[in-house]
């Protein structure tokens, strides 16, 4: 049975960039683990802000953290109070200096990670999974997605046996390298167990082969 490669790993250096950008020889494993802990900590702390992407750069003992969010106001706060509080919390927890940059996601309806989290939130509120998928697909197509595919896996609608249901509209060419495929994953914690939600959104072709900025 064929398995699907991660759309980002498949396109790294072609039309997708690395989300951790640093170089190390002896501290490589420590940095990888620290990046994972930083991402997990921020995701848990700012889940309501709709964090789409976290990019990490390291230089001169300082960590530069770039956050893409649907609600920058929640992250920054009034007069930058919240972002300064976050910087101090990160320094206290990880023992390093942080600089933070926040960019707004203009169209969250076609951002795969935010779409996946939105579906997971609906499933936790007991919305029927088919209705949640169809509503999300039509919204993404309305906002300019050329194709979208959603899969939900787990004990759907409280069924005894776990299964996978999927819904697709438009084209989603996963094997075409020049295709700009956005991918997101989220988990819905329901009374029956965890339901995994995966989203692929096709946004057109990248013709000039430049790595995304």
Swiss-Prot record:
CDD domains: KH-II_30S_S3. The keyword RNA-binding applies. Pfam families: KH_2, Ribosomal_S3_C. The keyword RNA-binding applies. Keywords: Ribonucleoprotein, Ribosomal protein, RNA-binding, rRNA-binding. InterPro entries: KH_dom, KH_dom-like_a/b, KH_dom_type_2, KH_sf_prok-type, Ribosomal_S3_C_sf, Ribosomal_uS3_bac-typ, Ribosomal_uS3_C, Ribosomal_uS3_CS. One of its GO terms (biological process) is translation. PROSITE patterns: KH_TYPE_2 (PS50823), RIBOSOMAL_S3 (PS00548). NCBIfam families: rpsC_bact. Binds the lower part of the 30S subunit head. Binds mRNA in the 70S ribosome, positioning it for translation. Belongs to the universal ribosomal protein uS3 family. This is Small ribosomal subunit protein uS3. The gene is rpsC.
């Amino acid at each position: 049975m064929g398995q699907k490669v991660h759309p980002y790993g498949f396109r790294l250096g072609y039309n997708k960039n690395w989300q951790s950008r640093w170089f190390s020889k002896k501290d490589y494993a420590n940095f990888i683990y620290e990046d994972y802990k930083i991402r997990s900590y921020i995701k848990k702390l700012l889940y309501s802000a709709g964090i789409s992407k976290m990019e990490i750069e390291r230089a001169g003992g300082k960590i530069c953290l770039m956050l893409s969010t649907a609600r920058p106001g929640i992250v920054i706060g009034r007069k930058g109070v919240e972002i300064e509080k976050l910087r101090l919390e990160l320094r206290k927890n990880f023992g390093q200096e942080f600089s933070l940059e926040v960019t707004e996601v203009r169209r969250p309806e076609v951002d795969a990670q935010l779409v996946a989290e939105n579906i997971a939130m609906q499933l936790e509120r007991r919305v029927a999974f088919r209705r949640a998928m169809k509503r999300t697909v039509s919204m993404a197509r309305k906002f300019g997605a050329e194709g979208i595919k959603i899969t939900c896996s787990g004990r759907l609608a409280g069924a005894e046996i776990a299964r996978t249901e999927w819904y697709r509209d438009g084209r989603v060419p996963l094997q075409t390298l020049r295709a700009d495929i956005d991918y997101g994953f989220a988990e819905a914690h329901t009374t029956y167990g965890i339901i995994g939600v995966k989203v692929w959104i096709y946004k057109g072709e990248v013709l000039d082969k430049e790595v995304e900025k």
